């Protein structure tokens, strides 16, 4: 699905494990069930958020500048995106994509997974969402595929997407369009510097 970069900050796709195509991602040493590195969020604050339902057969897009929500918690900076996904359909695969916009900025996502009781069950830091080069139908983006096995009896999971002050101090090196074109047509790769995208709170 092609989406306009100026309108999309985050795209979340939920589906059954077998239905999601493989994506090459850099190896990241992490244990998703270890939530100790995630910000501590009071239950009352989580309950005040509006959780957008995600249909596993569709892509859910959120423009953080206009559709993000505020969560005033230490360790979280800027607007957040909050989704709910069905947990009673077996093993889940969530693909989160954050596209680089025309101003060469990008939202570096962190993802906290909560069970139906709003208890943290998995955490994916921003380092998990790696840079993916543009393709025919895709833009420069940060992307990560999260595979989850909900506990028996769970009806839904909650997915909280946010960025941090530490992430805002970092950048992502992109592939220069001329290099991407040369690579695509089989020409020699020009020796030119790659653009650098700064990290922002809203991806716009």
Give the ranges of each region predicted by the language model.
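Noncatalytic modules at the cell exterior or secretory-pathway interfaces
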Residues: 90-94, 147-173
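Gram-negative bacterial Sec-dependent N-terminal signal peptides
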Residues: 1-25
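Short coil-to-beta strand junction motifs in C2/discoidin
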Residues: 103-110
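Solvent-exposed serine/threonine-rich low-complexity stretches and specific carbohydrate-binding patches
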Residues: 123-134
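Edge beta-strands of jelly-roll/beta-sandwich modules across compartments, strongly enriched
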Residues: 167-204
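Non-catalytic, beta-strand-enriched accessory regions in extracellular/secretory proteins
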Residues: 64-88, 143
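Predominantly extracellular/luminal regions of secreted and cell-surface proteins
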Residues: 27-62
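Exposed aromatic-hydrophobic patches
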Residues: 81-84, 122, 136-149
């Amino acid at each position: 699905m092609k989406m306009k970069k100026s309108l999309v900050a985050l795209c979340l796709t939920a589906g059954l494990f077998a239905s999601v195509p493989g994506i090459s991602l850099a190896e990241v040493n992490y244990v998703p069930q270890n939530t100790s590195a995630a910000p501590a969020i009071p239950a009352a604050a989580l309950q005040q958020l509006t959780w957008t339902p995600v249909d596993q057969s569709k892509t859910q897009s959120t423009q953080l500048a206009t559709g993000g929500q505020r969560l005033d918690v230490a360790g979280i900076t800027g607007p957040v995106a909050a989704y709910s996904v069905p947990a009673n359909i077996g093993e889940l695969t969530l693909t989160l994509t954050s596209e680089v916009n025309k101003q060469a900025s990008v939202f570096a996502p962190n993802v906290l997974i909560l069970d139906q009781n709003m208890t943290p069950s998995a955490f994916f830091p921003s380092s998990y969402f790696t840079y993916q080069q543009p393709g025919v139908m895709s833009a420069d983006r940060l992307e990560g595929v999260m595979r989850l096995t909900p506990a028996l009896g769970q009806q839904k999971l909650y997915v909280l997407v946010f960025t941090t002050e530490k992430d805002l101090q970092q950048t992502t090196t992109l592939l220069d369009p001329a290099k991407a074109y040369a690579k695509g047509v089989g020409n020699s790769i020009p020796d030119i510097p790659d653009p650098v995208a700064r990290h922002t709170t809203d991806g716009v």
